[in-house]
Regions:
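Polar/charged low-complexity regulatory segments
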Residues: 2-41, 98-148
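Amphipathic protein-protein interaction modules
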Residues: 63-120
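Amphipathic alpha-helical packing elements
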Residues: 35-81
Length: 148
């Protein structure tokens, strides 16, 4: 079966980045199309799936069940808001900023540097965050930093 990479972390669902990617990974994994090496679930609390479900006050397994029942990303996010919590606009802005910068001058920097080298991108100065690395690994050009 042919594999497919998930959408970029930057895809927004009701202003929230990463959520669409998490749902994409859930759907691709269930269909047997998620390439090997992608992290899904909440076993490691530092991975983005775990952080996102905690941010929304959700149980990951319940989110998987709901996602596989079908519906748009927006419909599933509304279900999340009703089931867990609805972050304020300010909280979403803080979440988005955290993810956009993760790996840049923080406790995840060392692991990011190691992962860059393993992926063959050790010499790439344009890869400064985990989102940059995901984009590069999936054939997208990392985005220049912006404050928005």
């Amino acid at each position: 079966m042919q594999t497919q990479t998930p959408c970029s972390d930057y895809v927004e669902t009701k202003g929230l980045i990463y959520f669409a990617r998490m749902l994409d990974k859930i759907r691709l994994k269930a269909a047997g199309k998620l390439p090997p090496g992608y992290f899904t679930g909440v076993e490691d609390p530092t991975h983005f799936d775990a952080r996102c479900t905690r941010f929304l006050g959700l149980n990951y397994d319940e989110l998987v069940d709901r996602t596989l029942k079908g519906g748009s990303d927006e419909e599933i996010l509304e279900w999340c808001f009703a089931r867990g919590r609805r972050p304020s606009e300010e909280e979403i802005s803080i979440w988005n900023a955290f993810l956009r910068k993760r790996g840049w001058r923080d406790e995840a920097s060392e692991e990011l540097a190691e992962s860059k080298k393993e992926a063959g991108f050790g010499n790439r100065d344009d890869i400064q965050t985990w989102l940059d690395l995901h984009d590069a690994e999936e054939g997208r050009t990392p985005r220049p930093f912006s404050y928005g």
